[in-house]
């Protein structure tokens, strides 16, 4: 059963990634952002994406600790999984439901979007990395890597669409904000929040 679920996840992830690559390399074909709810693109994308993510979780449970690649240090994966997907959920609240599902509810630059143009994707990749570490399973590592690639391709696939939709404000935002993570900006913010030391 484990291998059947793994093969299904592999097919879903590989198909999704090939369609995303075609979106990037061969416009006007577009699987993501999906043109409209109910379209074949939307149904195909969400079936493959949700299926790939769900099957990755199922394989992690079925194949848990099967290869003993790592020692107890792998349990750092659990907090990475929780924090990663917790931040991704926060990103949905910043972005709004409409924008999350390919709407045009306005360009979002506040909250997590000050530090990343794709905070949900970035955090989800961290969560997948945590899942792969914690599961200690070669099959889970393969599927998690496949879905992490999907998140990267999704970020690239939507940039042309967003540029066309929002024009110069989006292009300015791209120049000011990292695609995945503005490490320097985060460090600067943390530094500003440190209490100043006064000579006494």
Where are these regions (language model features)?
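Histidine-centered phosphotransfer motif of kinases
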Residues: 110, 114-122
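Membrane-anchoring alpha-helices and their flanking helix-loop junctions
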Residues: 1-109, 127-200
């Amino acid at each position: 059963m484990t291998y059947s679920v793994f093969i299904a996840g592999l097919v879903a992830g590989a198909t999704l990634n090939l369609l995303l690559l075609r979106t990037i390399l061969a416009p006007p074909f577009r699987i993501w952002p999906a043109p409209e709810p109910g379209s074949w693109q939307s149904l195909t994308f969400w079936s493959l994406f949700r299926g790939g993510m769900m099957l990755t979780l199922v394989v992690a449970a079925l194949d848990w600790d099967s290869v003993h690649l790592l020692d107890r240090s792998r349990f750092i994966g659990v907090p990475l999984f929780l924090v990663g997907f917790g931040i991704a959920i926060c990103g949905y609240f910043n972005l709004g439901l409409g924008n999350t599902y390919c709407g045009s509810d306005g360009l979002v630059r506040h909250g997590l979007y000050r530090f990343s143009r794709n905070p949900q994707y970035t955090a989800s990749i961290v969560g997948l990395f945590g899942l792969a570490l914690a599961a200690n399973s070669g099959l889970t590592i393969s599927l998690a890597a496949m879905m992490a690639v999907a998140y990267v391709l999704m970020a690239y696939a939507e940039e042309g669409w967003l540029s066309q939709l929002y024009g110069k404000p989006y292009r300015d935002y791209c120049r000011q904000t990292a695609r995945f993570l503005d490490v320097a900006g985060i460090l600067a913010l943390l530094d500003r929040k440190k209490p100043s030391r006064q000579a006494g």
